[in-house]
């Protein structure tokens, strides 16, 4: 998020996103490290929190892991819609959450597809709720 603020000269990330998108990109992701990520497209905004972890050993490589998971999901599905990008952010965030559990990317060599699916479900449970206004 600091890069977005520096590039746009705006402190508000919503304003920063508008300034940056006025420079050309139609879609913008602003990563907020341990606080999640924001996806901007047109008038739509999606926020994905980071998974709350008790132990964060080392954030080295987490941003690259997030990007790799995001792009891999888009490449695998060949669906570049806003809705699928929301899913891609969750996939990237899930993979990044593994990365911080050990030094560098070591933890990524220890996980399998079932671990990834379970972590993604943790994200779904974190943000999925029903609300009924009274």
What are these regions (language model features)?
Residues 9-134:
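Conserved phosphate-binding/catalytic region of the ribokinase-like
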Residues 2-5, 116:
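A generic structural signal for short hydrophobic patches within well-formed alpha-helices
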Residues 1-2, 33:
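Anionic group-transfer/hydrolysis microenvironments
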